Amino acid sequence: MLPAQHRMTRSTEFGATVSKGTRAAQPDVVVYRLRSDQTADPGPRVGLIVSKAVGNAVQRHRVSRRLRHAALAVLEDLDPSDRVVIRALPRSRDAVTPRLEQELRTALERIRQRTGAPS
């Protein structure tokens, strides 16, 4: 389970990250990352977007659990000021957790290369 301090819950955070953040697409997910300029951040925050295009409620919930698990695995690689939104694509309903984690790591690495950020 993703700790509460690392969960993105406000729609304004989601909106800012998606609209102003750097995007990297993978076959099963699209990842957006934005560096926050707030200095009192408790750590990186991660949000999930799993739309009805992914499948029915059971499938969406399964994908959400897998993505949360993958996000937890990469949490220590993120900077405390990072805001990350993971958008699940319809193909993600058939993806296993290790594949989602690998795609998340690949997407974050591509974003790092584009922005020139050290971490």
Curated annotation (Swiss-Prot):
Enzyme class, spelled out: hydrolase
Keyword Transmembrane: no
Record GO biological process: tRNA 5'-leader removal
A Pfam short name: Ribonuclease_P
EC number(s) per entry: 3.1.26.5
Transmembrane regions: none
PANTHER family on file: RIBONUCLEASE P PROTEIN COMPONENT
Gene Ontology MF, one: 3'-tRNA processing endoribonuclease activity
Organism of derivation: Mycolicibacterium vanbaalenii (strain DSM 7251 / JCM 13017 / BCRC 16820 / KCTC 9966 / NRRL B-24157 / PYR-1)
Domain of life: Bacteria
Known partners and oligomeric status: Consists of a catalytic RNA component (M1 or rnpB) and a protein subunit.
Family label: Belongs to the RnpA family.
Reaction catalysed by this enzyme: Endonucleolytic cleavage of RNA, removing 5'-extranucleotides from tRNA precursor
Region (Disordered) location: 1-20
One term under GO cellular component: ribonuclease P complex
Keyword tRNA processing: yes
Cited function: RNaseP catalyzes the removal of the 5'-leader sequence from pre-tRNA to produce the mature 5'-terminus. It can also cleave other RNA substrates such as 4.5S RNA. The protein component plays an auxiliary but essential role in vivo by binding to the 5'-leader sequence and broadening the substrate specificity of the ribozyme.
Keyword annotations: Endonuclease, Hydrolase, Nuclease, RNA-binding, tRNA processing
Taxon lineage: Bacteria, Bacillati, Actinomycetota, Actinomycetes, Mycobacteriales
Gene3D superfamilies: 3.30.230.10
Protein name: Ribonuclease P protein component
HAMAP family: RNase_P
